[in-house]
Amino acid sequence: MRGVLVEVPEQMLAERRRLGLDGRDEMWDGVVHMVPPASGRHQRLGSELLVALSPLAKRLGTVPSYETGLFRGADDYRVPDLIFCRAEHVSDRGAEGADLVVELRSPGDETYAKLDFYAALGVREMLVVHPGDRTVELFRLVEARLLPVSPDAEGGLRSDVLGVHCTTHDDGLHLSWDGGSATL
């Protein structure tokens, strides 16, 4: 369900901060988008992805983070489920740029509406993961736009940023890379 408040009362925002409910809220050109808590399945898959990919990311010199703000300005930021960025993009408030963002889909979320924002920041890839069936979509930056990548002959997708090949099988999402693999 969507609701629109023309003006969000400061006391509502303060209460969300006090209760810790604002951690996933986003600001889109000065407009607050209050994101509901993720499901348990969503959280577990996000954690599994972070655990599986963090050692690889670190070896490649990339900083992995979970639910970290990606900022274009103080009143314009998104909170992807996972972010992989270079150390120089890490800031006190979150990240000021990224090489790869991962969005785990939830019913009615705004994942695809974020494509232009991420492209404007120069995000090289966006991986969209569907927790229910563990399928993935990959978008790659081409001429300032994040465009969908077609699956390879095996039906999988390969992230150039991390060098990870993603395929979906009956037993889950398979990730493989030079020297390792994981099934989630």
Set out the residue ranges of the language-model regions:
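A solvent-exposed, acidic/Ser-Thr-rich amphipathic alpha-helical stretch
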Residues: 41
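C-terminal interaction segment
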Residues: 1-9, 14-18, 22, 33, ...
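Short, aliphatic-rich beta-strand segments
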Residues: 27-36
